[in-house]
């Protein structure tokens, strides 16, 4: 089995992981010279390309010097923790990719810890050494310190390192000498990554991932730990609770380049995809038909946040989306549960409302954004952090927060974090910038990014990861300003918007259609204010023609989905449709709102 190497890639968002895989694919001649491929071949759903993050793990196989290398791409974000753990189960070694300027970042820590615990051998790639002011040697030391902190074993600390620039297509053992290709990296993989360890015994495979195809149904993906598989072979599927379901394999596929190829036989140690099994979940074992033995199932991080999903019942419902009923939304969420391991779904006493639990705002907003693009309309409530009761004490999730920002604005940022019950752990100057580390409740992180970017003129870089549950730290002040709420249904008239500008900032553009109870702006004071922006100017003969003022309107504030979710208050929803995002009050009628308050 020396002809196979299984390796996972770990990297922080935007350190060049997907670019590196592109170059490996090109080097191993996966594309004929006449094929044009986009950049970032792996990030193949639109959301991933736009945000520059990898959400779902992918598998790619290349052949180099007669040896098959299975490359498994991992999500870098702690929000997708569920994905990370099960993917690492398939690998024998990891490629840790770090930026030569930024060094190892908090998100990298999360995945690396999981990899070291699974006893995988690390290879370090210091990427982007062509950047100005980068410090590859210091980064190498920082990686060593990080692994030492994470209690790596001695053989893991003795890791090989390669330097280079994936974008410019070269890698080398010494960062000062540029080479012609990325071969030194591939040679290092062959030399240092152990071949899969093959145990004697009956067939065993843990299902670590799944795929779906409209004509073959669900496809189980995993690594065959021992034994072999053949087409039309009878197997036993062992569920998490130990029950056994006799099944039969219809088709077997191995990974080949970016796709798969159909085979009749798979040996232990290789990654494969199986068609024809029914009713399996991630974490089940495919075992021998006569003498089935289960593999230990995968433990997944618990969710830390919940959001209310409900049907769109605003006056504009059904105008923009295809799927608007609660049945559609429920079916879509149940489908998501099958492949999104870190997510949980809970029904409420109302048929139209669902509570969805996830790993953070990013994890859930990616789901909402995907649904929105598929044509769903829905409304989302304010994100709620999950508070637990442990030994009779109220506990809440605490996160480790790293902020990298210009030195002259660091004081203001530190003040913001401490107001949100954050405590400072360290402050390190890095050139003209400061890197500050804090411990802060998850509740304090919701909405922090917007404020930070405003205070630092967009220069702050913020990363956070889940640390632990600890004692509840008391109330955190939310948004100080109230909302401007529309009084009438109609279109926003520039004349009215102009007259109300001193009352606050608007979220709607002139002539945009609005409805009663929609949040159309932010009040400059604390409480909510109901305004009428549908009034036109009276054209009676009383006014002199020459004394008209020209209307000067500030451009409206536009939110992204995450910003909108972090902005809303408890009594507000975000209305999500394929073509617009609107903020609204839960109760559209003002008298009803007053009654609920009283």
What are these regions (language model features)?
Residues 2-19, 91, 101-113, 119-121, ...:
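Conserved structured catalytic cores and adjacent interaction surfaces
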Residues 204-307, 315-319, 414, 481, ...:
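Conserved nucleotide-binding/hydrolysis modules and their immediate coupling elements
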Residues 121, 131-192:
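Canonical P-loop GTPase G-domain recognition
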Residues 14, 20, 52, 71-73, ...:
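Residue-level signature of catalytic and energy-coupling elements of molecular machines
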